[in-house]
Curated annotation (Swiss-Prot):
Residues 92-103 have a biased composition (Pro residues). Induction: Positively regulated by PhoP. Forms a homomer composed of subunits assembled in a large structure. The gene is mtp. It comes from the Bacteria. This is Pilin. It is found in: Fimbrium. Residues 1-30 form the signal peptide. Belongs to the mycobacterial pilin family. The lineage of its organism: Bacteria, Bacillati, Actinomycetota, Actinomycetes, Mycobacteriales.
Length: 103
């Protein structure tokens, strides 16, 4: 019976400690970023670089479409290209063996 009571108290202490630690994490404040434009941005309005690239700083637009184009979407900004860099050519030949003698 003593072991059961000990284990129950240990479990309760662990649960309580986890809950208290969780409250501490939730109480931290985060830095406030500038608000993202609701629908469109026009020249003369403030632009925060944290919103991403301002792909057309000369006309009003939303994230992808310029208002001056009307319903024509052929010149819309496609967004950032998320391809990784090509680090190695898989078809490249292996390097030649080192010249000279060796053990």
């Amino acid at each position: 019976m003593y072991r059961f009571a000990c284990r129950t108290l240990m479990l309760a202490a662990c649960i309580l400690a986890t809950g208290v630690a969780g409250l501490g994490v939730g109480a931290q404040s985060a830095a406030q970023t500038a608000p993202v434009p609701d629908y469109y941005w026009c020249p003369g309005q403030p632009f925060d670089p944290a919103w991403g690239p301002n792909w057309d700083p000369y006309t009003c637009h939303d994230d992808f479409h310029r208002d001056s184009d009307g319903p024509d979407h052929s010149r819309d900004y496609p967004g950032p290209i998320l391809e990784g860099p090509v680090l190695d050519d898989p078809g490249a030949a292996p390097p030649p063996p080192a010249a000279g003698g060796g053990a």
